[in-house]
């Protein structure tokens, strides 16, 4: 059995992705900062027949991300899919003229250093799985492609992450590893035809299985 590692796993999109991939036979590694919440989520997923386990890590600490991903592999099996989708902190979102150099440190650690550390950790295992197996999924808000003057930190950092993801797509595609980005404009809304977590999880599954595009965007704002 292979696994999906979800960095930024929570009760919304993360849980929906866990259920979707779990139903397809994946074990699920849940990664976020709060171990207690992860344990509760894993218990809920188990009721639906999903084999899941939580591993606490801070995305702004590359060593903790690497350790958590190593534990996923050791406990649940090789990581076939990595999803990077942590929710940015509210203090990352400041107006452009009020944003100082210090204000950008957190967003850049969160949205660039974190995924770089994660990718470096999972790549050897994905290469070992062979061509057309491994997938790296990035989930971003609309500011990744349309910067907002009042959310400067995430606009700058998400743009950097998007560039990194596209470069990975170009290079790793030659090795049969898919790299894709799901852009979700606005909030995730339960029951919405486009932005319900289960609907979005379906798009992420399609990006993994169809392997035919870099970016899928849900609304512009």
Q: Where do the PLM segments sit?
A:
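Hydrophobic positions on the long internal alpha-helix
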Residues: 68, 83, 107, 114-122
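Catalytic loop of short-chain dehydrogenase/reductase
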Residues: 88-89, 101-108, 114, 128, ...
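C-terminal helical subdomain
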Residues: 163-166, 173-221
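The beta1-alpha1 cofactor-binding region of Rossmann-like NAD(H)/NADP(H)-dependent oxidoreductases
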Residues: 36, 56-68
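A glycine-rich helix->loop->beta "capping" turn
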Residues: 48-51, 71-84, 209-213
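Active-site Tyr-X3-Lys motif and surrounding loop/helix of classical short-chain dehydrogenase/reductase
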Residues: 67-74, 94-98, 102-110
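Conserved glycine-rich cofactor-binding loop
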Residues: 10-12
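Conserved glycine-rich Rossmann-like NAD(P)H-binding loop of the short-chain dehydrogenase/reductase
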Residues: 25-39
